[in-house]
Amino acid sequence: MSVLFIDSSYDITLGLLDENLGWHDLRAFRGQRASATLQTETHRLMKDFHLEMKNLKGIVSIAGPGFYTGLRLSEGFADVTKFFSLPHNSFYSYEIPFWLGYKEGSWITKAYRGEYFIYEWNGDKSSIKLVTVKDLESLEIKNQVFIHSETSLDEKLKPFTNNAISTSDLLKDHPQKIFGRVLQGMERESYYFRAPEDEFRMNP
């Protein structure tokens, strides 16, 4: 049975995994109206492989880090599929490199209004921090840099990401290793850059 994959942390990525956790198909949609894209393209993907929700083994989504408005799309979709009694598993983008054998590294992305998210790890030790544009001026990263994708960057991050590895590309190339772990029952709380009440707060 197939597994549906959804990543709405940046733009929309949809995929279908076969019973051996290889990709039937993986499709990315950039710069389109996200809510309409998710519903329309999920329907098209399922139709292309002659599947209905009741035929799925489960759903896997990226739980962040990301913006509330983006992550809520995949969360809401997964909530609807509970009517079909489908299990929902989730994981964080920055977990991917460690699972694939990278013992240390830094995963970086633009966050909320001039802030930048950095997840660093070395073996079993890890840390998370948000830094400002000013902090970037003195930031030194000496290990391998990872990013979600090109759309998760801005000009301020470009000096740090010349040789970066995209976790979206790793996901595309190594689905068995990643989803074999996630489908063992992994479920993460959504990781928003800012709480909803802060993200939608009006500027004074």
Q: What is the role of each PLM region?
A:
Residues 1-19, 88-204:
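Oxyanion-binding and handling regions
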Residues 1-61, 146-147:
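N-terminal beta-alpha supersecondary unit
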Residues 37, 41, 76, 152-155:
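Long, highly charged amphipathic alpha-helices
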Residues 39, 71-75, 102:
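Conserved strand-to-helix beginnings and helix N-cap segments that scaffold or border functional pockets
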Residues 21-23, 77, 115:
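Short, basic/glycine-rich phosphate-binding loops at helix/coil junctions
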Residues 58-88:
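DPxDG-like acidic metal-binding loop motif
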